[in-house]
Amino acid sequence: SYDFRALLDDTRALSQNSDLAILNQETILGGSELGVSGYPAFNSPQEVGDAEVDAGYNTILSATNHALDRGEGAIRKDISYWKEKHPDVTLLGLHEDEADAEKIRVVEKNGIRIAILNYTYGTNGIAEPEDYLVDDLTEEKAMRELDRAEENADFTIVCPHWGTEYQLEESEYQRKYAKLFTEHGADLILGAHPHVIQPIEWVE
C-alpha cells in the first residue's frame, strides 16, 4: 500500500484550519487494481485521497484534462471511492449519471451557503463515452449553472481547469470566460492547469 501523508505536511496547517479547503486533483484515483500509471495516461492510487483528507482537504476538483486518461471505468472507481470512503468530502467535476450532473454543489459554512462549480477546457482529445461524466467548460453550461447557483447560494466559487501550461500570463480564452463568470454572478474564480502562478485581479 501507499502512504502520501508526508507530501502534504507543508500545507497541512493551512488546510486543516480552513472551513473550506479546496484541492485540484489532477489525476484520476482509479486505484491500484487498474494499474498505477504516469504520463501521459495517469491513474493514481486511492491512498492519495486518504492523504488529502488527512491533511484537511474537504473539497476535491476532478474536472481536469486527465479525467478520461483511463476511461469511464476509472472515473466510476474514483467516484465510488469518494462516496464510500469519504462521504463528507465534496467531489466536483465527475458524475455517475445525468441526475447527478444536474445537481449544483452547495456547501454551508458558518451559515453561508457556498456554491462551487468546476469545469475543464477539455480531456486531451479523448471523447466522453457519456456526456455527463466530466464537467466540460462551455458558455451555455456555465451560464445556466451560474444562474442556478445565484438562486441557491450566498457566494459562488468557479474553479475552471483552463489556460496554457507554464505561461505566467492569462490567455484571451481565460479572460473571456472570467468575464462571463463574473457577469453571471461568480464571486471568486480559482483556476488550475497552467502549473505556475498567474496574475490575480479584483473585478468591481
Regions inferred by a protein language model and the residue ranges of each:
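Acidic, metal/ion-coordinating pockets
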Residues: 1-204
